[in-house]
Amino acid sequence: MRLKTSLLKEPKHRELVSCVGWTSADELYSCSDDHQILKWNLLSNDTSVVVKLQDEIYPIDLHWFPKTVSGKKQAVAEIFALTSSDGKLHLVSKSGRIEKSVEAHRGAVLAGRWNYDGTALITAGEDGQLKIWSKSGMLRSTLAQQGTPVYSVAWAPDSGRVLYTSGRQLVVKPLQPNSKVLQWKAHDGVILKVDWSAVNDLILSGGEDCKYKVWDSYGRLLFSSAPHDYPITSVAWAPDGELFAMGSFHTLRLCDKTGWSYSLEKPSTGSLLSLCWSADGTQLAGACGNGHVLFAHIVEQRWEWKNFEITLTKRRTMQVRNVLNDAVDVLEFRDRVIKASLAHGHLVVTTSLQCYVYSAKNWNTPLIFDLKEGTVSLIVQAERHFLLVDGAEVYVYSYEGRLISSPKSPGMRMDILNSQSISLSNDTIAIRDTTDERVVFLFEAQTGKAIGDGKPLIHKIEVVLIALDQCGSSNDRRIALIDKNRDLYLTSVRKLGRAHSIYKIGSMVDTMAWNDSANILCGIQDNRFTVWYYPSVVFVDKDLLPKTIFTKDSSEFSRPPQMVSYVGSQVTVRRVDGSLVCTAVSPYPTLLHEYTSSARWEDALRICRFAKDQTLWSCLAGLAVANRELSTAEVAYAAIGEIDKVQYINFIKDLPSKDSCLAHILLFSGHVQEAEATLLQANLIYHAIQIHINLYSWDRALELAVKYKTHVDTVLAHRHKFLQDFGKQETNKRFLQYSEGVEVDWEKIQAKIEMEFAKERERAANSSVRSSVSVRR
Amino acid sequence: MAKDPLAEAGLHFDELNKLRVLEPDVSQKTTELKEECEEFVDKIGQFQKIVGGLIELVDELAKEAETEKMKAIGARNLLKSVEKQREAQHQQLQALIAEKKMQLERYRIEYEALQKVEAEQSEFIDQFILQK
């Protein structure tokens, strides 16, 4: 990926250009020290003078009023804020008329920024003050005051905090008074420019020490560049938060959000005083110190999937190469390509007006449909459909181009979703809330409605990354999430009446990804490459989890890597320095998942015997129990030496009725409550009581016995025996109360128990023969 | 000879017998003086012209020398700046080379990883074939 730059032969401005700003994807305004504001139309290649300012106005910073204001979208921006060296703040209309001028600071006003919803404007001055203004240019408050000039300022994604420079330090100050101010030394020279991405919440800074740095919003350093030859004069995040651009003297760099650089250009521009991305993220403009205005767009972006390699060769042209036979197809588009995604055998490309869907089988005839807004910021694909984040809404389309659903949630800012905060599977959409990061909303993909009772999943602490598994039935849909403590959790999406049980399956997990063809999870855990061959095993047999994990050393990935894809048996990881590293995962687990999902248990056993791998056997054991396939489970447990479990499975197999069988399988997986409910539903009350006696949960056993008025004496007898064995006195008040009226007679109790079993056997015999056979098969 | 009464009256006759107020000698001398004066003025004029031309010439020369001097200084500066330019270009190219080197390193790592995967896979295939 690189930037293709273009410069006119002769500069249009006579003096240095100080600031630029896009109105639409093809129209740019630029201000210069020659007091002129120029309008650049990229479609017609026209440049016209909008207005000639008064001679005492030397513009310094320009910022257009944001287009999206509280969900409503304006087609074009109408007004911009212009700050000048005489200490004034001007609000200028699109036609160049100065609507309002206010005396803002003593000395020059060095920066002026609107917040994301357009309700406030902040200005930073040479006098070291930060002032907040209303939309109409009325002074609201002075946020901060310091002894050194504030060179640059940026709003937080939630518009509730402000980042500004203070000499060599960066300061994050909340708007609310008396809240904690975050301040840290960021550079060895004066910091000249900062930017804060709304999408990924990362901070970018560049200064006179000739370095640029990437920080998270807590002020932790994520990346620091090597020193350049000249001070960094401008930095700018791309709107989708995946890339940023950095400008210096005769230097323009395109970097990944993790800091490493995609490409370096050396245009003769003088210092790049300001950089600005167009709203769709395809164009970049730079204000040059020698009077030029620099335009750049991204080319040679690449997408890979299985044997296809796609390159964006020009703005409107893509080249598809099939690596297997070197066949090359060229795809032409009517407009500029804004976003593209290649996965699950489909290529989805969006331009400013349309969406093209290609199938990997046929590159000639795309399916084309019109977009609603045309500012797609994210494409997420699943096997059956894909999702577009278009402006302030999320749309799910089928690969046939049919709009399936559009999930909505009040108060959510869909336009700042990124690939880490949204996940799509064939039946479910998971979206992390943008305001409260602990909350994950779950939607049905087919209808766009919230799943179940509509309550979102609420985690203990902030969630960093969410991912839905891609295969299997919708009832078994699981969501994996990494929280701020870097712990990996797994929970099921549809709870089906059960309580939301969430299991921690890993800690110190940097990144993770689900496989596209089987429910296998891979990640980097504590510097080791880890594959959870069957993560859902925590729902059936928690003890098996460590045995179903495959790990290997991941020093080749360096820290902290990013998972790019996990397709088939190949994992692609991007290292911190930007290089892609592939690694292969054993194909057996995928095969095993395939066999078990189609109930080919014999084949599953055969593959385990062939591979002779304990992890694989553990996997099979879990899969078999989950599918209530007891004989396979028995073999698998025997293979991994879990004799106690084999015994229990044998015991379950011998149980006379289907219901108690089911209950004991649930009990095997540790779901006591569900097991009890199953038994009570089947009217096997004694069995339910027995479960609790065996688990020493005496209170519940007695409660049940009293409630159903049966076997109270049995419970008391067992309790008595238990106390005797341990030489203890009865202290439980309820037991004392009931033991008074009941006489314990072991013979009678034994007889009663015998009777219960006989009754159960009888009932099982009466029920259809077929069903009992299916249970025991 | 007796005194000419006319001469006493201050009147004289010249050779052409025209009545004159001035003595013929004086008159002649006056004329001579006049002529000489004219001659002198002429000569002075000529001299001035010549000197003027000379000054012009010298001035021109001076100008030319000046421009040549400026040219020389300019050339010298240009030489210096070319050196600087070359340095800058060198710097730029170095930066570009460093960038390409980084890219190369990335590709090398990717290639190595892929080679490893290939080796693993062929090993797997061999194992698979042997066991069957």
Curated annotation (Swiss-Prot), chain B:
**Cited InterPro entries:** FT20 (IPR028172)
> Which cell locations does it reside in?
Golgi apparatus, cis-Golgi network; Cytoplasm, Cytoskeleton, Microtubule organizing center, Centrosome, Centriole; Cell projection, Cilium; Golgi apparatus
Q: Which GO terms describe its biological process?
A: cell differentiation; cilium assembly; intraciliary transport; protein localization to cilium; regulation of platelet-derived growth factor receptor-alpha signaling pathway; spermatogenesis
Instruction: Quote the cellular component terms of the Gene Ontology held in the record.
Output: acrosomal vesicle; axoneme; centriole; centrosome; ciliary basal body; ciliary base; cytoplasm; Golgi apparatus
Arranged from A to Z, the UniProt key words for this protein are:
Cell projection, Cilium biogenesis/degradation, Coiled coil, Cytoplasm, Cytoplasmic vesicle, Cytoskeleton, Differentiation, Golgi apparatus, Spermatogenesis
Any coiled-coil regions, as ranges: 74-123
A Pfam cross-reference name:
IFT20
**Purpose:** Involved in ciliary process assembly. May play a role in the trafficking of ciliary membrane proteins from the Golgi complex to the cilium. Regulates the platelet-derived growth factor receptor-alpha (PDGFRA) signaling pathway. Plays an important role in spermatogenesis, particularly spermiogenesis, when germ cells form flagella.
Name recorded for this polypeptide: Intraflagellar transport protein 20 homolog
Q: Which organism is it from?
A: Danio rerio (Zebrafish)
